[in-house]
Curated annotation (Swiss-Prot):
UniProt GO BP: protein transport by the Tat complex
Task performed by this protein: Part of the twin-arginine translocation (Tat) system that transports large folded proteins containing a characteristic twin-arginine motif in their signal peptide across membranes. TatA could form the protein-conducting channel of the Tat system.
Biological source species: Shewanella denitrificans (strain OS217 / ATCC BAA-1090 / DSM 15013)
GO MF annotation: an example: protein transmembrane transporter activity
Basic and acidic residues bias locations: 67-79
Keywords: Cell inner membrane, Cell membrane, Membrane, Protein transport, Translocation, Transmembrane, Transmembrane helix, Transport
Name assigned to this protein: Sec-independent protein translocase protein TatA
Length: 79
C-alpha cells in the first residue's frame, strides 16, 4: 500500500537506463566505486597511523622507564 514494490523499482530502473544510457551509468558506477574505495583506504591508513603513533609512544615510555632503572641498579652494585 504505502511501500514501493519490486515492480515499481524495476520500472524506475528501466526509465533511468533509457534516459542516461548504460555507458554513462557504468562510468558513474565506476566513479562511485572508486570514491568509496578511496574513502575506505583513507580510513584504514588513518587508523594504522594512529596505531603506529600509539605503539611508538608506548615503546618510548618503556625505554625511558628502563633507562631510569639501570642507573639505580648500577649504584646498588657499586655500593
Amino acid at each position: 500500500m504505502g511501500g514501493i514494490s519490486i515492480w515499481q523499482l524495476l520500472i524506475i530502473a528501466l526509465i533511468v537506463i533509457l534516459l542516461f544510457g548504460t555507458k554513462k551509468l557504468r562510468s558513474l558506477g565506476g566513479d562511485l566505486g572508486g570514491a568509496v574505495k578511496g574513502f575506505k583506504n583513507a580510513m584504514t591508513s588513518e587508523t594504522s597511523e594512529e596505531e603506529k603513533k600509539a605503539l611508538e609512544d608506548s615503546q618510548t615510555a618503556q625505554t625511558s622507564q628502563q633507562a631510569e632503572k639501570k642507573p639505580e641498579s648500577k649504584d646498588k652494585e657499586q655500593a
